[in-house]
Amino acid sequence: MFGVLNSDDHRAAIQQRNILAFGRTSSELWTSNPTSNYWCETRGNGRDSGQNRVRRPMNAFMVWSRDQRRKVALENPQMQNSEISKQLGYQWKMLTEAEKWPFFEEAQRLQAMHREKYPDYKYRPRRKALPQKSDKFLPAASSTLLCRQVLVDKWYPFTYRDSCSRATHSHMEDQLSSSQPVNIANSLLQQEHHYSSTSLRGSPETLATHLSADPPFYPK
């Protein structure tokens, strides 16, 4: 009985070990894309699925800065990578054409090897993440006050002289301050229509009084 149990445990342990070993090993896949037929290695998790990116060949500056970056990083371990790049860019600009020429030759050699190894290679830049909008909106109280002032100035641009007009204006301000921003426009339209129709139904004497409230303006 113990021999049967030991054999079963041994068989299960072997299967588990094989599964783990299969997950760790990398499988070589031949890509089906005719524009990039080259061997690539992918992990057992299958995330890459044979879509490993081919790096661009280095240019002259990259060839020169490959060793220089390591040297600057060793001399200044606290310096950030962005600062190292700025310093290397400045040093590269200070070099003469004769000093740069060996690195241009090396870059041309690397580009020729790259074309020979990947004849159908096409550069495909990665898409940059869209920056988040940093528009700052006004607070609710400030935006409500601003909207109220703009709407009042738009619908009542004339000067109020009689007590009825002042009362209407103060009533409008109270409604604008207490109402929701969504219903402001509808309320103004309804009250403006009601005020206009009421004024038109008045007597000719009332209309004449309102028209003669402001003195006529004569240009000089």
From Swiss-Prot:
Q: Which domain of life is it from?
A: Eukaryota
Q: Which GO terms describe its molecular function?
A: calmodulin binding; DNA-binding transcription activator activity, RNA polymerase II-specific; RNA polymerase II cis-regulatory region sequence-specific DNA binding
Q: Which one Pfam family would you cite for this protein? A: HMG_box
- Which UniProt keyword terms apply here? Activator, Calmodulin-binding, Cytoplasm, Differentiation, DNA-binding, Nucleus, Sexual differentiation, Transcription, Transcription regulation
The UniProt entry's GO biological process terms, in alphabetical order, are:
cell differentiation; male sex determination; sex differentiation
Q: Where in the cell is it found?
A: Nucleus speckle; Cytoplasm; Nucleus
Q: Which residues bind DNA?
A: 54-122
Q: Does the keyword Zinc apply?
A: no
Q: Name one GO cellular component term.
A: nucleus
Stretch list, region Disordered:
193-220
Q: Which PANTHER family match?
A: SEX-DETERMINING REGION Y PROTEIN, SOX TRANSCRIPTION FACTOR
**Could you say which protein family the record assigns here?**
Belongs to the SRY family.
Complexes and interactors: Interacts with CALM, EP300, HDAC3, KPNB1, ZNF208 isoform KRAB-O, PARP1, SLC9A3R2 and WT1. The interaction with EP300 modulates its DNA-binding activity. The interaction with KPNB1 is sensitive to dissociation by Ran in the GTP-bound form. Interaction with PARP1 impaired its DNA-binding activity.
| Summary of the function given for this chain in its UniProt record | Transcriptional regulator that controls a genetic switch in male development. It is necessary and sufficient for initiating male sex determination by directing the development of supporting cell precursors (pre-Sertoli cells) as Sertoli rather than granulosa cells. Involved in different aspects of gene regulation including promoter activation or repression. Binds to the DNA consensus sequence 5'-[AT]AACAA[AT]-3'. SRY HMG box recognizes DNA by partial intercalation in the minor groove and promotes DNA bending. Also involved in pre-mRNA splicing.
Quote the protein name from its UniProt record.
Answer: Sex-determining region Y protein
Lineage of the source organism?
A: Eukaryota, Metazoa, Chordata, Craniata, Vertebrata
